[in-house]
Amino acid sequence: SRAEIEFFIQGVTSGDIPDYQASAWAMAVLLQGMNERETTDLTLAMAHSGETLDLSQIAPNTVDKHSTGGVGDKTTLTVLPLVASCGLPVAKMSGRGLGFTGGTLDKLESIPGYRVDLSKQEFLDQLADFGLVLSGQSADLAPADGKLYALRDVTGTVQSLPLIAASVLSKKLAAGASGFVLDVKTGVGAFMEEREEAVKLSRLMVKICEMSNRNVVCLV
């Protein structure tokens, strides 16, 4: 139930639920799966496990994009300025490399003087001033995701579709954008190698966004 999921996430975040119990839960999700309602409740509980941003006072509609990543993925660096130049505010928090793929932050940090560690206020100020902000993820946003991801990484449960979807979207929901563009890469060199699995993930993430009252489009 929603109450049970919220209790579990609160316990994981506070440390009241030990790692071995959380790991067993993650393995149960991998083996048994979760339905769309359960996955959405998990995503929302993770999103509200820490601080959340309210961007509505800066702009009524803001967008964010997420790519599941792959070799040579640099879409963020071109898509964000193009969208912002059309007058639609873009507020994005990016991540680092996962496995063998290079993350957006890793690429940006190769530019001398570029800062990715913006404070919450700097993030909001830049969005208000320029209509575009790109920063690293704050540790205060969706802290439950950080704990669960670390456990998934060492327990062989990284590939669970409900856990992947909840991990991606909990951070996005916490960051406050009203609409998302999701880019699910597939094939050799991508995080999701099999197209069938990529399509399943994309449909699940679209459903979660719809059930969370967010506008979304997903490309595979």
Residue ranges of predicted features:
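Glycine/serine-rich anion-binding loops at beta->alpha junctions
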Residues: 61-84, 88-100
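A glycine- and small/hydrophobic-rich beta-loop-beta segment
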Residues: 7, 208-211, 215-220
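Alpha-helix C-terminal capping segments
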Residues: 31-32, 78-91, 171-176, 212
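General beta-strand structural signal in soluble alpha/beta enzymes
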Residues: 64, 90-94, 116-119, 134-137, ...
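A glycine-rich helix N-cap at a beta->alpha junction
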Residues: 107-133, 202-209, 213
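Acidic, glycine/proline-rich low-complexity segments that act as flexible tails and inter-domain linkers
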Residues: 1-72
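Divalent-metal (Mg2+/Mn2+/Ca2+)-assisted nucleotide/phosphate chemistry catalytic cores
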Residues: 112, 124-193, 197-198
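Residue-level signal for inorganic ion chemistry
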Residues: 25, 108, 182
